[in-house]
């Protein structure tokens, strides 16, 4: 099962839609900001399974602040991250929440910075921002799950090409708070 993970699209959906069209994922996860963009995916691709949570800019959204889903036998904790205290240099208490629900993978956004850490045997990924990156490269995350295991995790640019987190530099002239 291939899963595309997006966060922080902020209404700029063209790259997100192009990636879905070109990569044909089995499911999409949107981690907030803007939840309406996930709704647009659902309307445009009615046969595509789309999971979403709300972010700090999703005023009036009915989506949950977090969600726990099981895909191909792997349990995921989904959140935007703002309520778990994430910052550029820390995943906050996401590992604690994921562990409480028995999840082996936690996904979050909010910082606009792609990241992967392992904390207490839990893989914690931030897909970065598909539209307003703080690291200079807009990104999403592609996960491959088979037989109850994470087989592959690759950060992709807006063309669907793999990117290395170590090669990204903060080229933005903006400071995001």
Model-based region annotation:
Residues 1-48, 58-60, 64-65, 137-139, ...:
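N-terminal active-site segment of His-dependent metallophosphoesterases
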Residues 9, 56, 82-84, 130, ...:
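Short, solvent-exposed coil/turn elements at secondary-structure transition points
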Residues 11, 15, 36, 59, ...:
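Short, electropositive, low-hydrophobicity segments enriched in small/polar residues
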Residues 15, 99-101, 125-177:
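Binuclear metal-dependent phosphoesterase catalytic core
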Residues 23, 27, 38-40, 60-118, ...:
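His/acidic metal-ligating clusters that form di-metal
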Residues 40-52, 116-132:
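Short acidic, glycine/proline-enriched helix-loop-strand junctions
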Residues 1-3, 68-77, 118-124, 143-152:
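Beta-strand-turn-beta hairpins that frame and shape the catalytic cleft
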Residues 5-7, 27-33, 51-56, 78-80, ...:
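Active-site neighborhood of phospho(di)ester-bond hydrolases with catalytic His/Asp-centered motifs
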């Amino acid at each position: 099962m291939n899963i595309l993970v997006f966060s922080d699209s902020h209404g700029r959906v063209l790259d997100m839609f192009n990636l879905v069209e070109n990569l044909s994922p089995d499911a999409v996860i949107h981690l907030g900001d803007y939840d309406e963009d996930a709704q647009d995916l659902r309307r445009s691709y009615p046969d595509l399974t789309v999971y979403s949570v709300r972010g700090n800019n999703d005023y009036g959204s009915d989506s949950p602040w977090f969600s726990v889903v099981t895909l191909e036998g792997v349990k995921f904790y989904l959140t935007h991250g703002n309520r778990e205290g994430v910052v550029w240099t820390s995943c906050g208490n996401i590992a604690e929440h994921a562990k409480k629900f028995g999840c082996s993978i936690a996904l979050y956004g909010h910082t606009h910075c792609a990241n992967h850490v392992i904390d207490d045997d839990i893989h914690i990924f931030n897909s970065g921002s598909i539209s307003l990156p703080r690291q200079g490269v807009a990104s999403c995350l592609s996960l491959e799950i088979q037989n109850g295991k994470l087989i592959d995790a690759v950060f992709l640019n807006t063309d669907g090409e793999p990117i290395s987190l170590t090669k990204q530099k903060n080229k933005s002239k903006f400071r995001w708070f």
